[in-house]
Amino acid sequence: MSCPIMEPIPPMAPVLLSACLKEAGFSSIGKDLNIDFFNHFKDSGHWGDIHNLFAIGHVTKISLPRRVIIDILKFIKQYLLEVKKQYDPEYIGLSIFTSESVDFSILVMSYIKKYLPEVKIVLGGRGLENHHGLTDMKHYEMYNKFGMADLIVVGDAETSLIDALTDDATGIY
């Protein structure tokens, strides 16, 4: 599942990795949360502020009306519950394509843990390899330290993800 990068561009990683997993005998589907989120909120009248909040929110103070924040959280919850209903996944993988995806991914991970506690969270993507602005850690190190994901695949994942899932690996792989 792609985490929003706040641009209406379909990311390739979820579809590519889904195909690799299928080839290796896993059941998998690529979901584009990025496009679904964009389509849901683009005409809300608040898209500019929503975009800025998640794209540069950790740098700049952006203020959104409470109702918009509630709508974003409801969207994430409904999206995840629909994924659960349709696919009943054992894992949900999040593609953190750029550092713009990082803030949104934290919301998604917290909602997976809250509403789908039996589903394991797998993270990957180049956005995880950037340094967190407030620490010396890279994002994937921070996520691992605080137990935000069950498995974090660093680097190209076409084969390492398959190996990690086959080995039932946890932590940084």
For each predicted feature, which ranges?
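Conserved phosphate-interacting/catalytic interface
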Residues: 10
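Short glycine-rich hinge loops at helix-strand junctions in the catalytic core
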Residues: 25
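Nucleotide-activated donor-dependent transferases that construct or modify glycoconjugates
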Residues: 1-6
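Glycine-rich, highly charged phosphate/nucleotide-binding loops
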Residues: 48-84
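Short alpha-helical interface elements
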Residues: 45-46, 53, 116-117
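N-terminal beta-loop-helix "entrance" segment that forms/cooperates
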Residues: 37-50
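Glycine-rich beta-alpha loop elements in corrinoid/cobalamin-binding modules
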Residues: 13, 17-20, 29-35, 69-173
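Flexible, glycine-rich phosphate/dinucleotide-binding loops
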Residues: 7, 37-39, 130
